Amino acid sequence: MHLKKIAIIRCLKTSASCAGAGCLRAFYEKDKAFALYGEEELRLMAMWTCNGCGDSMLENQEGIRKKIERMKALEIDALHLSHCTSKKDEQGEKHLCPTIKAIADELADCGIKIVQGTH
């Protein structure tokens, strides 16, 4: 059975008040979005944040390039987009953050599976 290499990306703004415990619990218990792997062996290769957007954008934006290149070098099988990477609009509909979408699109173009959600 093939070992699945998994990474989780989360929102920089949310990480100020979130320890990531829900994402990690779901991963280790193969619950919620990780249930799709069934009995496959998983390895968490990275749990990382974007470099922000709007007022929270980090000055060093070249760091995000390093993170993206690291994901490619690790040859991850799937990138899970944490629950916090989508926000509700005024009508209550969830939309993926444009910054996260750009990162996910680039990694998807390299053959990495993008999975919406963690817990």
Where on the chain are the PLM-derived regions?
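Hydrophobic, Leu/Ile/Phe/Ala-enriched alpha-helical segments that form helix-helix packing faces
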Residues: 68-71, 103, 107
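Short Gly/Thr/Asp-enriched flexible loops that form oxyanion-binding sites at enzyme active sites
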Residues: 90-106
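Divalent-metal-activated hydrolytic enzyme cores
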Residues: 108-119
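Oxyanion-hole/transition-state-stabilizing segment in secreted/luminal serine hydrolases
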Residues: 85-87
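Conserved mixed alpha/beta catalytic, RNA-binding, or beta-rich assembly cores of soluble enzyme
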Residues: 1-71, 92-96, 113
